[in-house]
Structures are given as structure tokens and as C-alpha cells.
């Protein structure tokens, strides 16, 4: 029974989006009302035509009735055309607002959401689910209102014409209600599973497109074909279940019930003496029963679309209602850029399995600091905490003697920048990839390109800064992408600069270039380099060595090399390999 009841909160939220287009809704429903009235009047006119032409033989009056009938048909067609335009406009406006809201909420979600969920799930909800809700507005709501009006007017007319026959015809309503409730109960869990499989299909295609080089290199095509086939078969299975449910509970069952009621009407007509019911009245009732049957069939058959929209709404509102990334309200910018981490513990889950344990460090401003350690030792995790993506489980992080959790998003964004191992390059110009829409002069951009030694390459391009870089910067080498990523961070003059494995994928020349860049900006910003390449951080002011989520030692390169240390073993082991 819960499946029948729990759609109301979601439906109310979906209908609330229509309040922004109240005027259009009122106009659309008004046009629907009049077009429905005109449609209901047509059988009465035909009934009168039969009476006056075939029985009373009054030709002139019959011609008038035909004229009225044609006028009503034309008016109904005009009104239907305009209300279709209006409801399509309403649905597009509502979906535009809904997509904006879900996209806006997605942009503010905690980073852990993207770490824990496949990207395909988000794409499915933003595209496929919102398109499903569009059908709720341009098909279901319009049709529901129109058919309810048709049913009410038809019923009133039937009771005015002949109440006995009307009572028999009304039996169809409780039957239709039972069918709708049964359909709703059985269809909702199936539709939820269909949505999950659609999201999985989006996700696997996203993986294939983004990782096509690796898939082909390691001959994994067959594995992904099997994955697609498995998900597609599951999707097909549940689609067929819903189609079978539609085929049994919707149109066929209602048609059968309607036929039984029609037999009942004919039986009543036959039981009463000849002349008790006019032949025109019987014709009108047969017509009205069909008119009743069609709206009820439409309403029940649209239960599938309605249920899909409710399930899609639940998935969308789950994103919208997810607590956003939490920031404080301290809008005072950094003065220096020093960092203090005290008694810090961190776990990605709530099971007390800490990936960082008892971290205590102090980093003075404008120093070059390095975090080193083997893969999985906790270096990059600490960087995520330093930029505010995750809160500490225990302990605290202070920037400029203030708790990081008190800062606004804007302050953190302007004062802390990070260069990732795999730079994200937009399908835009070089200029836009550096400025990212910020109000930065071309002169300043050229200056930073000169600093990172990309100016010669940019000047060699026919369009210079206006050159389009293509999908993920496909006209650039890996080293050039990384230098461009460094340029976009340095141009905003951050107080703290974090380089997370920024040199791991570049050649030796680019690595040396990056070292020179860091040396030139060292007096302007606090630099934290997270790296496996120990040769790049030999001149760091302090090196923190991580192992199993703990800092096991710290000091300069030369101090750590002089004594028997974990760092020394790492350094010489790497030197021998090189």
C-alpha cells in the first residue's frame, strides 16, 4: 500500500514547478474546458439530428443542427491546437527550471558523492529523468484535466438524458479506480529498477568513451561487451515486465468491462416496452459510453508515464535534497598562508578505519613543503582536507590561525589552488582555459605564459590565445597540459599552492621547467608538493614522510639522507631503479 500513497510528496514537488507558469496553466486549462464542452455537445446534436430528420422529418431544422455540429468541430480543433502549444511551452519552461536546479545542486554536492557514485548516475538523472518529467506536464497533466472534464460533463449529460442508463454506465468508474491502484502498486518497484539499469547503461558508456584508449590497448573490448549485454538483458527483462503489466491491466481489461456495460445498456433497452427509450437516446448513450471509455483508458494507460515521472522525480529530488558541501561564514582573506594541523584523524567511512592518524604539522607561510610516501600512504587525502573537500573526522586544520571549517567557499577558492596529476582542459580557447571566466587581462595572461615558458608555443599558433584546444586539449602534449594547468592556478596568486603528483606524467624537461617555476614563485606563496619523484623536492624547506596514514619522519632532504631513515631507503631505491 505504501507504493500507492508515497507518490504524493514527490508529485506535489513536481507540480510546484508549475507555479512559475500559472498564467499559462490557467489559459491552457480554460481552452481545454471549452474544447471538452464542445466535444460533449456533439452527440447531443447527433441525437437531435436523428430525431428531427429520421423521425419527425424536419429537414430545415436538421440542416441547422449539422451547421452547429460543424462549427463546434472547427472551434474544438482550433482550441485543441492552441492548448497543445501552451502545454508544450509549460513543459519546456518547467523542465528548464528543474534541470537548472538539479545541475546547480550537483555543483554544490560534497566531493565524496562523486567519489562514491558512478558519473553515469548523475548524467542519467540530469538528462533522462528530467525528460521523463517533461512528459508529465505536456502529456499526463493536460490529458488528466481534459479527460476529467470530459467525464464529468458526459456524466451530467447522461443523467439528464436518462438516469437509469447513466447508473449502469457509472459502474465503469470503481472498476477503473481498482485497475489504476493495482497498476500503481505493481509497477512502481519495476520502474525503479528500470531507472537504475538506465543509469548503469549511461555509466558503462561513460567509462567506455573516457577509457577507450586503455580498453583497446589491453584488449578489454570483449569484457565491456559482456557488461553491456548483461545490463541490457536486465533492462529488457524489466521493460518486458512493465509491458506485460500494461497489456493486461490497462486498455484490454477496461475494454472488456466497457463491453459488458454496453451489453447491460442494450439489455435494459430491450426489457422496457417499445417507445419507452428513444432510439436517439440509445445512440447518445452508446456514443457517451465510448466517450467515457476512451478518457478512462487514456488515464489508466498514462499510469505508466505517471509512475515513471514519479520515480524520476524521486531520483532528482534525492540530489536536490542531498546536504550541500558545508562551508563557514568567515569571509576575511588570508594574510599569510601558514598551515597548522593538530591531532588530525580522518576516515572516508564511519567505521573508524582511519586513513590519516594523529597528523600534527606546522607549515610557515611562503615555504616549499613536500609530502612523500608510497601509494596509499595518505598524502593526497591530506591535500583534499587542506582544500576543504572533506572535513576532519577528529582534530582540526587551521589556516592563518583560523579553523578551515569557518571559511566561506569563496575565501578557500581564492586563497588555495591545486594542480592535479591529470589536468582538466576545457574544449575552449587557451585564454578561457587560463582565465576560466575570471576578469583577468590579456597582458597578465601573456606574462604568466612567459613565466611557465609556453609563450613561444602560443605565439607559434595562427590564432594565438584564441586557439581552440579541442576535447580535453587534444592539440597539447601531456607536459603542455600540465603547464597550462599551473598557469591557471598561478594567475590568481593563491596564498597556498598544492601540486598533487603534478610531475608524475611529464618528461624530464617539463619537470625541470616546473621546478624552475616553483623556485620563481616560492617567495609569493606556500607550496606543498605531493610526489613520488623524490628528485623534484630535494630543495624543499621541509619534507614530511607518510607511511600507512601517519607521518613517520620529517626534515630537509639532506638531514633525512644523513641518518638511517624511511626516506633514505625510498630515495636510494628510486635512484637505483632510475
Curated annotation (Swiss-Prot):
Record EC number: 7.6.2.2
InterPro entries from the UniProt entry: AAA+_ATPase (IPR003593), ABC1_TM_dom (IPR011527), ABC1_TM_sf (IPR036640), ABC_transporter-like_ATP-bd (IPR003439), P-loop_NTPase (IPR027417), Type_1_exporter (IPR039421)
Record-annotated ABC transmembrane type-1 domain positions: 25-308
Stretches assigned to the ABC transporter domain: 339-573
Domain of life: Bacteria
GO cellular component: plasma membrane
Keyword Signal carried by entry: no
Binding site for ATP: 373-380
Membrane topology: Multi-pass membrane protein
Keyword Cell membrane: yes
SUPFAM superfamilies for the chain: ABC transporter transmembrane region, P-loop containing nucleoside triphosphate hydrolases
Segments crossing the lipid bilayer: 26-46, 59-79, 143-163, 166-186, 196-216, 260-280
Main location: membrane
GO molecular-function term, one example from the UniProt record: ABC-type xenobiotic transporter activity
Root EC class: translocase
Catalytic activity of the protein: ATP + H2O + xenobioticSide 1 = ADP + phosphate + xenobioticSide 2
Protein name (Swiss-Prot/TrEMBL): Multidrug resistance-like ATP-binding protein MdlB
Amino acid at each position: 500500500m505504501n507504493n500507492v500513497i508515497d507518490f504524493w510528496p514527490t508529485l506535489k514537488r513536481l507540480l510546484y514547478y508549475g507555479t512559475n507558469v500559472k498564467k499559462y496553466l490557467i489559459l491552457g486549462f480554460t481552452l481545454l474546458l471549452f474544447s471538452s464542452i464542445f466535444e460533449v455537445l456533439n452527440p447531443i446534436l447527433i441525437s437531435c439530428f436523428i430525431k428531427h430528420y429520421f423521425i419527425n422529418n424536419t429537414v430545415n431544422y436538421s440542416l441547422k443542427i449539422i451547421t452547429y455540429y460543424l462549427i463546434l468541430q472547427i472551434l474544438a480543433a482550433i482550441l485543441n491546437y492552441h492548448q497543445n502549444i501552451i502545454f508544450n511551452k509549460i513543459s519546456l519552461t518547467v523542465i528548464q527550471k528543474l534541470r537548472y536546479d538539479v545541475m546547480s545542486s550537483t555543483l554544490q554536492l560534497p566531493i565524496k558523492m562523486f567519489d562514491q557514485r558512478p558519473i553515469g548516475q548523475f548524467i542519467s538523472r540530469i538528462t533522462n529523468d528530467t525528460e521523463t518529467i517533461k512528459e508529465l506536464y505536456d502529456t499526463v497533466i493536460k490529458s488528466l484535466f481534459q479527460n476529467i472534464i470530459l467525464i464529468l460533463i458526459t456524466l451530467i449529460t447522461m443523467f439528464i438524458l436518462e438516469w437509469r442508463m447513466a447508473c449502469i454506465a457509472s459502474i465503469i468508474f470503481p472498476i477503473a479506480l481498482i485497475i489504476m491502484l493495482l497498476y500503481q502498486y505493481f509497477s512502481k518497484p519495476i520502474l525503479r529498477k528500470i531507472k537504475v539499469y538506465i543509469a548503469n547503461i549511461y555509466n558503462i558508456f561513460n567509462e567506455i568513451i573516457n577509457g577507450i584508449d586503455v580498453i583497446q590497448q589491453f584488449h578489454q573490448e570483449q569484457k565491456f561487451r559482456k557488461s553491456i549485454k548483461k545490463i541490457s538483458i536486465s533492462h529488457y527483462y524489466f521493460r518486458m515486465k512493465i509491458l506485460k503489466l500494461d497489456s493486461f491491466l490497462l486498455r484490454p481489461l477496461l475494454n472488456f468491462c466497457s463491453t459488458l456495460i454496453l451489453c447491460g445498456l442494450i439489455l435494459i433497452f430491450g426489457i422496457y416496452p417499445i417507445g419507452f427509450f428513444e432510439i436517439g437516446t440509445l445512440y447518445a448513450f452508446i456514443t457517451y459510453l465510448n466517450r467515457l471509455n476512451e478518457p478512462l483508458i487514456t488515464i489508466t494507460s498514462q499510469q505508466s508515464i505517471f509512475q515513471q515521472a514519479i520515480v524520476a522525480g524521486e531520483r532528482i529530488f534525492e540530489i536536490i535534497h542531498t546536504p550541500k558541501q558545508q562551508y563557514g561564514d568567515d569571509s576575511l582573506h588570508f594574510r599569510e598562508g601558514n598551515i597548522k594541523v593538530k591531532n588530525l584523524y580522518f576516515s572516508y567511512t564511519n567505521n573508524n578505519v582511519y586513513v590519516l592518524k594523529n597528523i600534527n604539522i606546522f607549515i610557515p607561510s611562503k615555504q616549499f613543503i613536500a609530502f612523500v610516501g608510497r601509494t596509499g600512504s595518505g598524502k593526497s587525502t591530506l591535500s583534499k582536507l587542506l582544500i576543504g573537500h572533506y572535513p576532519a573526522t577528529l582534530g582540526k586544520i587551521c589556516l592563518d590561525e583560523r579553523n578551515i571549517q569557518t571559511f566561506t567557499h569563496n575565501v578557500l577558492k581564492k586563497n588555495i589552488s591545486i594542480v592535479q596529476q591529470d589536468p582538466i582542459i576545457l574544449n575552449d580557447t587557451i585564454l578561457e582555459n587560463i582565465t576560466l571566466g575570471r576578469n583577468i587581462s590579456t597582458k597578465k595572461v601573456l606574462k604568466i605564459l612567459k613565466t611557465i615558458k609556453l609563450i613561444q608555443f602560443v605565439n607559434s599558433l595562427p590564432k594565438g590565445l584564441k586557439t581552440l584546444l579541442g576535447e580535453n586539449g587534444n592539440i597539447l602534449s601531456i607536459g603542455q597540459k600540465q603547464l597550462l594547468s599551473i598557469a591557471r592556478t598561478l594567475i590568481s596568486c593563491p596564498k597556498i599552492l598544492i601540486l598533487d603528483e603534478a610531475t608524475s606524467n611529464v618528461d624530464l624537461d617539463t619537470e625541470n621547467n616546473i621546478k624552475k617555476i616553483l623556485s620563481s614563485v616560492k617567495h609569493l606563496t606556500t607550496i606543498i608538493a605531493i610526489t613520488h619523484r623524490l628528485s623534484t623536492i630535494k630543495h624543499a624547506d621541509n619534507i614530511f614522510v607518510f607511511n600507512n596514514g601517519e607521518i613517520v619522519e620529517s626534515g630537509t632532504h639532506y638531514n633525512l639522507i644523513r641518518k638511517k631513515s624511511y626516506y633514505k631507503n625510498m630515495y636510494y631505491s628510486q635512484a637505483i631503479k632510475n
